[in-house]
UniProtKB/Swiss-Prot annotation:
Underlying gene: rsmH
Localisation per UniProt entry: Cytoplasm
Protein's name in the database: Ribosomal RNA small subunit methyltransferase H
InterPro entries tied to this protein: RsmH, SAM-dep_MeTrfase_MraW_recog, SAM-dependent_MTases_sf
GO molecular function list: rRNA (cytosine-N4-)-methyltransferase activity
Annotated organism of origin: Actinobacillus pleuropneumoniae serotype 3 (strain JL03)
Length: 313
């Protein structure tokens, strides 16, 4: 077992916050407070009139946020898909100058064996971002069919051995009274089911990702947040999103591309470009940003991060 504990280092900290083009008197949302790296930097750029609202599903993130003694700051224990509801309750719909989302699982969540996210540390097989709601991974695996599990592994983990792994997991649970309940127990069953090992990647990597995404409805949450962002943002409001795997990044990229594209109009028609742009809700800001080699060296977990920024017209 790997006992190395990674200090939590906020990925693309300055790039993501710079992407918000902070207005000192603006109103901002950090949809994924985590351990507060982005939030604290945003607060440092705001005037006394500025405001920051943060959300997070993780009770431990909420506890960390409650240590911030700042009248400009407010934390709400909810998923970032509920940002429109939060804004409505606060009378801020259409008044938000920027939203930052840092997707995926954080280092403290991975490193805390009790959370059940890591296949490198033995702990209860939980995987819930919000430990107060829903089924744990162990509870779900105890009742899922092999077909449904294979679908989850294939869809959310792009796992090539999805059927083989699913069959092994479900068969094991059917054959014993004490179902799979520990992270390393599941990791070993997966490893035994995979015929070819990738020397650069643990055989349980994709399966753990897939189960975590499913348990937390991560892609549904992201889809809801993206679809509601335009109604929440003020004109010229920024969207700054960090993703860590191709499924998330694909969704963010397609959303920004779709909403920044004008109509295809035949050449020669007497229509001004400004008229065409009236109905285009977003403008993409720059190219996708990846971590520098220096950041990757300092924090290897940042390697797969991709930051995309867009602005509401």
């Amino acid at each position: 077992m790997n006992d190395t504990v990674h200090k939590h280092i906020t990925v693309l900290l300055h790039e993501a916050v710079d992407g918000l083009a902070i207005k000192p008197n603006g109103i901002y949302i950090d949809g994924t407070f985590g351990r507060g790296g982005h939030s604290r930097l945003i607060l440092s750029k705001l005037s006394e009139q500025g405001r920051l609202i943060a959300t997070d599903r993780d009770p431990r993130a909420i506890a960390e946020a409650n240590t911030i003694d700042d009248t400009r700051f407010q934390i709400v224990h909810t998923a970032f898909s509920a940002i429109p509801d939060v804004c409505e309750q606060l009378g801020l719909t259409g008044k938000i100058d920027g939203i930052l989302l840092d997707l995926g699982v954080s280092s403290p969540q991975l490193d805390d064996a009790e959370r059940g996210f890591s296949f490198m540390r033995d702990g209860p097989l939980d995987m819930r971002m919000d430990t107060t709601k829903g089924l744990s991974a162990a509870e779900w695996l105890a009742q899922v069919s092999a077909d449904d599990l294979a679908w989850v592994l294939k869809t959310f983990g792009e796992e090539r051995f999805a059927k083989r792994i699913a069959q092994a997991v479900v068969s094991y649970n059917k054959s014993v009274t004490d179902k799979i309940s520990r992270t390393l127990q599941l990791a070993q069953i997966i490893a035994d089911a995979v015929p070819f090992k990738d020397k650069h990647k643990h055989p349980a990597t994709r399966s753990f990702q897939a189960i975590r995404i499913f348990i937390n409805s991560e892609l549904d949450e992201l889809e809801k947040a993206l679809q509601s962002a335009l109604s929440v943002l003020a004109p010229e409001g920024r969207l700054s999103i960090i993703s860590f795997h191709s499924l998330e990044d694909r969704m963010v990229k397609q959303f920004m591309k779709k909403n920044s594209k004008g109509m295809d109009v035949p050449k020669g028609l007497p229509i001004l470009e400004s008229e065409l742009n009236k109905n285009i809700p977003l403008k993409i800001i720059g190219k996708a940003i990846m971590p520098s080699e220096a950041e990757i060296e300092a924090n290897p977990r940042s390697r797969s991060a991709v930051l995309r920024i867009a602005e509401k017209r």
